[in-house]
UniProtKB/Swiss-Prot annotation:
It comes from Avian sarcoma virus (strain PRCII). ATP binds at I278, G279, R280, G281, N282, F283, G284, E285, V286, K301. It catalyses: L-tyrosyl-[protein] + ATP = O-phospho-L-tyrosyl-[protein] + ADP + H(+). This is Tyrosine-protein kinase transforming protein Fps. InterPro entries: AH/BAR_dom_sf, F_BAR, FCH_dom, Fes/Fps/Fer_SH2, Kinase-like_dom_sf, Non-receptor_tyrosine_kinases, Prot_kinase_dom, Protein_kinase_ATP_BS.
Length: 533
């Protein structure tokens, strides 16, 4: 406990005569002799050792003073212990203090010495100070409990927004696809600045008369301009157009009204430290990494700079899907780096790797109940996606990840689509479709839905209980399609429980309407796991 206390100070008198001094000594002496049960003062040596002058010596008064101080110390310790155990918030903390002070009552106790000065003499009149009550003493000591928890560095000078570099401007979106710009600009006069993909040019994109308009920012002689005056930086150019309401060009008559700010998912490339390569995807390589801010382990998907703009847009589709979701069985998006090339998608790093490799290496050592639990995780994640009208379209063991605690997470949303009616019609041909995992209506008519994902989940179940075997291993893609049309289905894996295989067969109903929902699949797997204790 801290807080400065003051020694008692005798009342001052205006008279300075020797008679007045004699009167004070006499009064003090008489007062001392009138105190009940007070013995005569000890020798000067004795009471000096006690820290008192002869005029203040009173054994009972001294004992009472020490008793009060001991009570204060015990009360302080009790309050510290109690409040450290009970206080849950500042409001509750203040309420408890008020309660404790109210218990002290309104009557003020005699003055008390400061704790740090218990052994100092109080007879020196030139150092005597005004007394404080015991209540004030306690308050001062308790003030130490509320000392600031953290010390802050001195404030730094604030940099005006217009003087910050381009990459720190909230309206600079980096190398986002042109198609995404159209989704971001909502009202006439909305604008943003981006990097033109493949051309290393900066573009001002504005919505005007319902159409997105794109203006290349000219750079020459260390100045940036659109039409008219040049400016040393692009932020100064944009600030001038906003403040002056000058048209971007005389011919267009377009005026900037509102900046469209990048969302919280956008990271700078410098925010991410890349580690080793851990895989390769359709669009580029995958690296392990860490966030500079807090050392969070991450997986970083990179997009090859040589890809055409339409494929770069498809690469970012996964991030646009994932940033809407939050579920323990869905891999978590951390952010995207679009400020420059190459574009990154930053996701949580799931240390156990992909489910297919896990099944082939560790599957033989798993208990049946553990395997069912992992498929229960997959069903829970897919039930969540179903509730969000998200169609995965590429559900397979290779696209699921396993944590160090054997929790399964749905991943790889590169082919995913989110549709209001839960149905997606594909017109892109068969080039990238995983035929052996895809429902017949999707193969025949390009019709994708949660029901087609349920078919794929049945194949995932088969992969899990066959410990990573290839479905239809002896058939080509075309032969597989023909066999399915003729009613042929995969045989049950060795040692697969009968109730699990019956669930697979329900997932493989030819008519999508007869397949169970993911909610029903999830509940079935919970019941199956309980039966396999």
């Amino acid at each position: 406990a801290s807080g400065q206390l003051h020694r008692p100070q005798p009342q001052e008198h205006t008279s300075t005569s020797a008679a007045a001094g004699t009167w004070r000594h006499t009064q003090a002496s008489e007062s001392r002799h009138r105190l009940p049960h007070c013995s005569a003062a000890p020798s000067h040596q004795d009471h000096s050792a006690m820290g008192f002058g002869p005029e203040l010596w009173c054994p009972k008064g001294h004992s009472e003073l020490l008793r009060l101080q001991d009570s204060e110390l015990r009360l302080l310790e009790l309050m510290k212990k109690w409040m450290s155990e009970r206080a849950k918030s500042d409001r509750e903390y203040a309420g408890m203090l008020h309660h404790m002070f109210s218990q002290l009552g309104s009557e003020e106790p005699p003055p008390a010495l400061p704790l740090q000065e218990d052994r100092q003499s109080v007879c020196s009149t030139d150092q005597e100070r005004s007394g404080v009550t015991a209540l004030e003493t306690i308050k001062n000591h308790i003030s130490g409990i509320f000392s600031p928890r953290f010390s802050l560095p001195p404030p730094v000078p604030l940099i005006p927004e217009v003087q910050k570099p381009l990459c720190q401007q909230a309206w600079y979106h980096g190398a986002i696809p042109r198609s995404e710009v159209q989704e971001l600009l909502k009202c006439s006069g909305d604008f943003l600045v981006r990097e033109s993909q493949g051309k290393q040019e900066y573009v001002l994109s504005v919505l005007w008369d319902g159409q997105p308009r794109h203006f290349i920012i000219q750079a020459a002689d260390n100045l940036y301009r659109l039409e008219g005056d040049g400016f040393p930086t692009i932020p100064l150019l944009i600030d001038h157009l906003l403040q002056s309401q000058q048209p971007i060009t005389r011919k267009s008559g377009i005026v900037l009204t509102r900046a469209v700010l990048k969302d919280k998912w956008v990271l700078n490339h410098e925010d991410v430290l890349l580690g080793e390569r851990i895989g390769r995807g359709n669009f580029g390589e995958v690296f392990s990494g860490r966030l500079r801010a807090d050392n969070t382990p991450v997986a970083v998907k990179s997009c090859r700079e040589t890809l055409p703009p339409e494929l770069k847009a498809k690469f970012l589709q996964e991030a646009r899907i994932l940033k809407q979701y939050n579920h323990p069985n869905i891999v978590r998006l951390i952010g995207v780096c679009t400020q420059k090339q190459p574009i990154y998608i930053v996701m949580e790093l799931v240390q156990g790797g992909d489910f297919l490799s896990f099944l082939r290496s560790k599957g033989p050592h798993l208990k049946m109940k553990e395997l069912i639990k992992m498929m229960e995780n997959a069903a829970a994640g897919m039930e969540y996606l179903e509730s969000k009208h998200c169609i995965h379209r590429d559900l397979a063991a290779r696209n699921c990840l396993v944590t160090e605690k054997n929790t399964l997470k749905i991943s790889d949303f590169g082919m995913s689509r989110q549709e209001e009616d839960g149905v997606y019609a594909s017109t892109g041909g068969m080039k990238q479709i995983p035929v052996k995992w895809t429902a017949p209506e999707a193969l025949n008519y390009g019709r994708y839905s949660s029901e087609s994902d349920v078919w794929s989940f049945g194949i995932l179940l088969w992969e899990a209980f066959s410990l990573g075997a290839v479905p239809y291993a002896n058939l080509s893609n075309q032969q597989t399609r023909e066999a399915i049309e003729q009613g042929v289905r995969l045989e049950p894996p060795e040692q697969c429980p009968e109730d699990v295989y019956r669930l697979m067969q329900r997932c493989w109903e030819y008519d999508p309407r007869r397949r169970p929902s993911f909610g029903a699949v999830h509940q079935d797997l919970i019941a199956i796991r309980k039966r396999h204790r």
